[in-house]
Structures are given as structure tokens and as C-alpha cells.
């Protein structure tokens, strides 16, 4: 019965035709291709450039730019288009120069005794060509075990200990010749495993040893989120692989014929490959750049990047003086060889030396490692084997001879301990103490200077206040009630913060034509905004606090200090401020296209915004918020994101403005609590509006509302349908599969892809979910907007579409009643903006 079953499947697979599979009796001729099941990869014949030579390989099927990831006959091209791919009589997948099968070009070369008569060749969606038996499911050969120059996700680099399989990358000869080049990236078999890029037989660049999360020579290698790195070192194999958690992300790593290694990601919007990271990129990356027992210190070097390790001196001082480091360093002549008083100097942020000759013990601690090194006179240095593992620093690496290819990094690397005698140890300790004394002396001097400057400023401000009482203003305006004690404290703050440029009141009056009504651009929550022109013809916008402004000195100082410290393409740029004669004013760059609400909430102007422009505005706002939340020196929560606070320059680039209510978070602080709720009805997250609780997810909520308003051209709080607001209406349509009905009908349908708009609506709904923990963060939003992501999570019920109970566990944040206006205005405790 078993024999009949095998024969049945044998004949079935001979005559079954599949787009991703070559059957035993089928052939693939030049001009024909097979596609993987998801049509991500193609396998067939190809040529490069204007060449007539034909190769058989694998490439991306959905990318317009030809990108080859694997070549079968890389060193044996076919001269014309008469080639053919088919199974040989003995069962190997083979490439022939012609259909008469007389000239064999390439073969999978599996032992005949292993092959089965039911073999097929299948191309997977990972880009892996697999020779396997569909009856037993056994795999006999796969292209992932024989890579060329490209390292794809879920491929493995390394070697197996039993059968000797070596998976390494070999560069092309040139851009137009995929033949085997000189550059080879392989896993070292000697010592502690590491990846080294060779040029011929000479080490060119060292990827380093595994740290527990990444390779020591690639500090920019990402950890987690989209990319997952994995390293295996056991009795069967030593290998490295990486995967992607988002199937829409297309990425590859390759060895270039020029001697560099690159990680590329595909940017579908721009139809191009983005260079995610590349190495080597500086002198310190070159293998053994500073010779034996030297290390490269490029980040802190002003003249020569090479330094001898502690206890060593240049082997050839004259060459070293002439910036020739090839001779490296040797042990200092007077240094004792082995003594009970030996110690270790710790070097921080190091790429540890080549581990080919290092000994390793993964079962001892770093403290035990130090003791063992001291007891062994041949031990010259030690370090943790995995310093970034989930269990912390584990394992012990020891060096017993010359140390090659060490360097420092600015914000990465690990601790490296060099053995020195007692004299050298005392010298390093003295240098460390003298450095601390210098820092202490500098701090004392700075404090004294600040105190002296404060006293001087106190005298200057007091004299200015006296003179101001007797001086009348040339401007005809109504002054705002103002606390002079606050003004004085602001003057003190100016002395401590040199990033606050100051404008003279007369300069502002002249620039705005005495605050002429013709120069008035509009009025915000804290007062009118005027256009001005300085004497150098520079156009400015002046925000002048009105008499009824709820913004006090703290909010005023907050906005000035925050914006002066922030620099980003999508944040409004402050030019300075003016605090004089009871006036408080902010001076900004002038943006001619006003604010976003002028465009999206007015039919005539909204018609000018096609889909590409709206998407660029959305992406710009997202990048600006991400900068505030994650990439700036300060973690900042804006708390008042809305359409009127998004300004547009002459090129319609969005700029986030109005930081009066922003809050600074500490590096590890995730959320805050306030008894004074400020913001704009319709844009505030529920936990903030009702409980006084705010976090970066509060801004995410506001962004989601703003994004949905941009897509629909409708205002959230002014939307009157059966649902309570625009968000609720969109949710109802989304639930019923009718969300396309809400797309702004003023947009030309030819300018947008309906699937992309639906994706953006889904992202907006992911931002406005009721529970803050369910909302995506801004880094995820930026990635979703930048990639053709298709597997987005399903949004949960948004906020403010049904009754929500106020208070709860964190309701104590609000100690007083919060006034809320149904109009689209910002509000505070008891008064509207």
C-alpha cells in the first residue's frame, strides 16, 4: 500500500503545474519565471545592464528597481538565451547552456544516494529556493545555505560543526559582474565566534563578537521593535540570523564590491532603497588600524586617533610621531611582568579586541574572571563575553597575547580591563583624581561667575525700572496688568539662559507700525498676532499678550524657554521675546500661509489641498510630535495640539506652535497629573479632560483627531450628526465598512489611492482609542505613514462616543471643577481661551 501511495504522488507532481514550483519533469526556459506564493520574489534568467550574458537567480518581484539577491551560476554565465533549468536524471536541479543538456553550467550537487524521485524545487516568500520531497517533507538543499552577496531576513550566517557547512557572503566582482569578488564576510571558527569581513585573505573590517543583543562592531544595529536579532552558539552550529516583525518592511543586508557592508530598507513612497546603516565608515573601523596593543579613539581625538593601551608604548616612536600606527605598541620597558600588586585599568565604551585567540568561559562572573586573570601571568586583559544579555553581563573573555582592532565609541561599547603593574595603576589613578579636581574647580568658578552676574543684573534691572517710571511709551496701546516682581524674576532667568534673544520695545513698535490693525494677522487664545518687518527687512510675527490673557509669567517663560531649546523642521522657530513696560511679547518667524484651520475648515481653501499635500502635512506634524516626545533634548508633552496651532510656511510645510501649556517630562517619566486642565474641547484625550492625567498618549489622541479632520475636512467638535462628534461618526462608518463615505469630496479622486486613505483613517482611529495604553506611540505612527503597512492592528472603540465616567482611580488629579466650553476654544480652570 505504501508503494502505491508513493507512486501516486510521484505521477501527481509530474503533471501538476504551480507558479512557485518546478516539478521533476518540468523545465524553466529563458524568458520564463516562477513567482513565490505571495509574489514577493521571482526566479529565472536575467542580464545586467547592457550585457548579453545570462544568469539564473532570484530577485524582488514587486520592486521596479532590479535587485538581485541570489545568483546560481555567478561564475559561469550563459552566452545567449538558449539556457534552461531542469532536474537532471539523477535528481539535482541544474542549469544547462541549451536544451540538449550537453553543457552543464550549475547544479545543486546533492549526493545521488540522498535524492528521492518525487523531488520538486519551490521558491518561498522569504526568497529561499528549496529542493524538497513533498511526500516526506524532507529538505535536501536550499539557496539560503549557499548565499551570494545578500543576507535576507531569516537567512543564517555561520557554520555547522558536524557537516562543515559554511554560510558566508561573497561580494560581486563589480556592479555589472555578479562573479565571486574579493570581499568575504564569514564567521570565525577560532576562539570566541565573531564575524569578519576579509579582502582576499586579509581582514578588512571586523563586525566583532556578539554582545547578547548585537555585534560589537555595529553599535547602530537596531534592537527589537521591527528587527529581531538572534545568535546561536551550541554543539551543532554557530550562526546569526535576523527577522522582521512587520511583513510589509522590505530589507536586505549585502557585502559591496567596494569593501563596505550595508543594511538597506525599501521606501515604497520614493521607490528607492534607503541606506539604513553601513560599515566601515571611518578610519577607526578599519581592521587593526592602530596596530597590535593600540586602540582607536576617533570621537575624542583632536590630532592622532591612535593611542596605546594602558601599560604600553609605541613600538616605533618615530613612526608613531609621523602618524604611522602600523607598528602598534609594545609593553613598556620598565613594566614588571607579573606581580601580586598588578591591577586593571578600566576602559569604557570599547569595542573589545579580536577574540580569535581569546579564551572564553561562559559559566563564571566578571569578578571571578578578574581573579583568574590575576592568577595567570600570561593573561593581559579580560571583559564580559555577553555584556548586553537579558541576565546582564555574563561570561568571561581573557586575552593572552597581542590585542588587535580595539576602539572606542561615543555612546556604545563595553568595559574592557587591561592588566598593568602597580606604577602604571597608580599613574592612571592620579590622572583620574586630577581630572575630577579640574571638574570641581570649573564648577566652583562657574557658580561664582553666575552669582556675580546675578548681582550685576539686579542692579541694572533696578536702575532700569526707576528710569522706566519716568519714561512714557511712544506706542498708543492698552497695557496689560503685570507683576513687576515676576518681571524681575524673568530678568534673572535671562541671565541664566543665554538662549533667550531680547528685542527692544521700540524695535517691535516700529516693525509692526505701532501695532496697526492693518498688520494684524489674527488673534489666538492669549492675544493678537501682528506681522512686522525689521530694519534688515526680515519679516516677523509678534504674539502680544492681551489684557484678558490667562497666560501668566510662568506660561510665558515656559513657551520662550521651550521653543528656544527646540530645533526641528516641523516646529515654529522663535526669534526672541520682549518684556518691557508691562508688555510681554513673543517674536516668531513669519509664516505666510497662516494656520492649518484656515485651509481645512474653509471650502475654497480646502480645495487647494490635494491628497499628496495633506499627507505631507500629516507626516510633518507626526515628525514634529515624535521629536518632542523622543528625539529632542527634553521630553515634551504639548497638551494643546489643534489645527489652529499648526502653522504653514510658503511651501506648506507644517510647523507646530503655541508651547505655553507644554510640560517637560524627565527621561524616564511616562505620565503626569495636574489639577489645572488646559486645552481645546474636541482635541483633549479623555483621561486628561476628565481626570487631569496626561502623557505622550494625550498628544497622540490630539494628533489622531487632527489627522481625521485633515482627511475629512470637517471639524470634530462642530460635527452634528447622530454621533456625538466627527470621531464617533467615523467609527460608526468604519464598523459598517463604509468609511470611504467620509473622505473629503473636494479632493480629486485621481490624486489619491483609496486604500492609502483607508489606512490613514485606521491610523487615526488607532490614535483616538479610549484607553491610553491601547493607543500607538508617535514612532509607530511615523513608521506606519512611511511604509506600505498592510497588517495594522484593528482599532478599539474611540473616546467620547459614549458616556465615560469621570474620576476613577486617578480622579484625584482634579481638585477643582474644570470649565468646559463646547466651542472650539482652549480652556483653563475657570476661563476660556
Swiss-Prot record:
One of its GO terms (biological process) is recognition of pollen. Residues 604-621 are annotated as: CaM-binding. It comes from the Eukaryota. The modification Phosphoserine is found at residues 549, 564, 644, 657, 717, 821. SUPFAM superfamilies: alpha-D-mannose-specific plant lectins, Protein kinase-like (PK-like). Residues 338-421 form the PAN domain. The keyword Protein biosynthesis does not apply. Disulfide bonds join 284-296, 290-306, 308-329, 369-396, 373-379. Coiled coil: none annotated. Residues 19-440 are extracellular. GO terms for cellular component: plasma membrane. Keywords: ATP-binding, Cell membrane, Disulfide bond, EGF-like domain, Glycoprotein, Kinase, Lectin, Membrane, Nucleotide-binding, Phosphoprotein, Receptor, Serine/threonine-protein kinase, Signal, Transferase, Transmembrane, Transmembrane helix. It is found in: Cell membrane. The active site is at 640 (proton acceptor). ATP binds at residues 521-529, 543. Residues 515-800 form the Protein kinase domain. PROSITE patterns: BULB_LECTIN, EGF_3, PAN, PROTEIN_KINASE_DOM, PROTEIN_KINASE_ST. It catalyses: L-seryl-[protein] + ATP = O-phospho-L-seryl-[protein] + ADP + H(+); L-threonyl-[protein] + ATP = O-phospho-L-threonyl-[protein] + ADP + H(+). Its EC number is 2.7.11.1. Residues 462-833 are cytoplasmic. Residues 19-144 form the Bulb-type lectin domain. It is a single-pass type I membrane protein. Residues 280-330 form the EGF-like domain. Belongs to the protein kinase superfamily. Ser/Thr protein kinase family. This is G-type lectin S-receptor-like serine/threonine-protein kinase RKS1. It comes from Arabidopsis thaliana (Mouse-ear cress). The gene is RKS1.
